[in-house]
């Protein structure tokens, strides 16, 4: 193999490695189902049909720096939590039935409870009310 052919193959391999390194972390983000909500007073309103077959959606909420994670439980109830990790403020990501902070590995249940530290606190949880086909999330209060 001559030098020119070697450098050409090295360049192609390097480009493939860089594309893979950039694309792999982004591939998980592309699969998340984001929805827009309507803000009525201090409540976010989304339609139940937004979920489709997925058990959760990420909601871009006006006034919130990060999206909310809204989870549909098997009994038909819903939970809404902030995606802001309570350890250092990184955005948690849905994965395999729970939420994981990519910064330091904290893990939370779908309703925001701590599964694994270093986080000292559960995720901020918002009260949810189902009104017919609408899901109302109260941004002014914290759920207990």
Name every feature range the model reports, one short phrase each.
Residues 89-116:
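Structured, soluble extracytoplasmic/luminal domains of envelope-associated proteins
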Residues 28-95, 122-144:
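N-terminal pre-ligand scaffold of iron-sulfur
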Residues 107-108, 113-120, 124, 130-132:
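Exported/periplasmic cell-wall-interacting domains
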Residues 1-21, 25:
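N-terminal secretory signal peptides and thylakoid transit peptides that target proteins
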Residues 4, 83, 110:
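Short alpha-helical basic/polar micro-motif
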Residues 14-18, 93, 120:
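Short amphipathic alpha-helical segments with coiled-coil-like heptad repeat character
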Residues 19-22, 39, 44, 101, ...:
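Preference for short coil/turn "hinge" residues that link or interrupt alpha-helices
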């Amino acid at each position: 193999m001559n030098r020119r052919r070697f450098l050409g193959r090295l360049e192609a391999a390097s480009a493939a490695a860089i594309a893979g390194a950039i694309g792999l972390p982004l591939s998980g983000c592309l699969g998340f189902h984001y929805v827009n909500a309507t803000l009525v007073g201090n409540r976010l309103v989304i339609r139940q049909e937004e979920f489709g077959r997925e058990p959760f959606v990420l909601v871009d909420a006006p006034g919130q720096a990060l999206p909310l994670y809204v989870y549909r439980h098997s009994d038909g109830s819903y939970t809404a939590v902030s995606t802001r990790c309570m350890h250092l403020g990184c955005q948690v990501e849905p994965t395999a039935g729970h939420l994981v902070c990519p910064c330091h590995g904290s893990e939370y249940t779908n309703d925001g409870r701590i599964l694994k530290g270093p986080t000292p606190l559960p995720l901020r949880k918002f009260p949810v009310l189902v009104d017919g086909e609408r899901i109302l999330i109260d941004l002014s209060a914290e759920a207990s």
